[in-house]
Amino acid sequence: MDFRKTFLLFSLPFLFSGIFAQNKAINQNDSAGRKTGIWETYYESGRVKSRGTFNVGHPVGELTKYYPGGIVQAVMNFDETGRISYVKMFYETGNLASEGKYIDQKKDSVWNYFSTYDKRKAVSETYQMGKKHGLSYKYYVGGSPSEMHEWQNNLKNGKWEQYYENDQVRIAGGFVADSLNGAFVSYNPDGSLSITGSYQMGAMHGTWTYYSETGEEEFSVEYIDGRMLPNAEMDKRIDEFSKKVKDIIGDIDEIENPENF
């Protein structure tokens, strides 16, 4: 008898039984009905959507999620309790989109977000149990910070600064409960004053002073709860200085929905 045929004849049953055993080992529950062992989910196309290992109903170790085309969408590494995970999320290009930590499926500690175009870190935010709490930064292409906000309980609360690319402070101010509040100062690129004033819960209030590009004082105006008091000099130059203020503070919006990562 041909020994190769004999080997194949006896090995086939074991081969197929091994395949069936592997398939049987996927997506199992323990006696209490909890997920255990390797679990996979699938798209309608049949492609794997997620793959990970479970113990007494929660994920442990590495869990990977995939886009419909098979590209890795996220890699999550869980501790033995399943409560804490360290996550990397990816664009469909394969480039890193964000990385950070979850506790009980809520963002915690520092999260970094990356540009899909040049792979650079674009934003970093600090979270506490799903809410922004601490410092957040936006970055220039070169890597230096362009803006900093202080957050408390998901609201802008505290210090706020914008920077020129040479790290010189461009704007210094503050927020209370998401509203501009307190002293406001903007600087020219050489460090000289551009505008000084103050806000009262989102409204310009008190004396606002405007300076030339060389830092020389030009004139001052008074505001009460966002309303400018009559001022002849300002009446002459209202359009010019309104545009100046808008240009200076027009960049304070956050990037578009970083929470989507």
Q: What do the PLM-derived regions correspond to, one by one?
A:
Residues 1-26:
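Bacterial Sec-dependent N-terminal signal peptides
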Residues 19-261:
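Glycine/tyrosine- and acidic-biased, solvent-exposed loop/turn segments at the edges of beta-strands
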